């Protein structure tokens, strides 16, 4: 069942699926920001978001900085 699968996922990874997916997307975006000169809007779409401002909000919640700040920081 869906509930059992969700339980197993959380037991295995330590986080629910949505948090895992968000973390994965932010990590992919960080890599693209470090290694490409793509616009934030393009990266947003590539990692699965359709709204740039929402993506920037999620990114900032996870990293403490906006995508543009992250790119400029050379982290």
Residue ranges and their predicted role:
Residues 1-2, 50-51:
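Short coil turns linking two alpha-helices in DNA-binding domains
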Residues 15, 57-75:
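…primarily DNA-binding HTH/wHTH and HhH modules…
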Residues 5, 9, 54-55, 59:
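Short hydrophobic/aromatic patch on the recognition helix
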Residues 11-50, 72-75:
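Terminal helix-turn-helix DNA-binding modules in bacterial transcription factors
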Residues 2-3, 12:
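Ampipathic, surface-exposed secondary-structure segments
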């Amino acid at each position: 069942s869906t509930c059992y699968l969700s339980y197993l996922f959380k037991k295995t990874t330590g986080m629910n699926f949505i948090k895992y997916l968000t973390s994965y997307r932010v990590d992919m975006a960080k890599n693209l920001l470090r290694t490409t000169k793509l616009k934030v809007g393009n990266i947003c779409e590539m990692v699965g978001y359709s709204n740039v401002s929402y993506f920037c909000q999620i990114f900032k919640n996870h990293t403490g900085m906006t995508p543009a700040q992250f790119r400029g920081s050379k982290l």
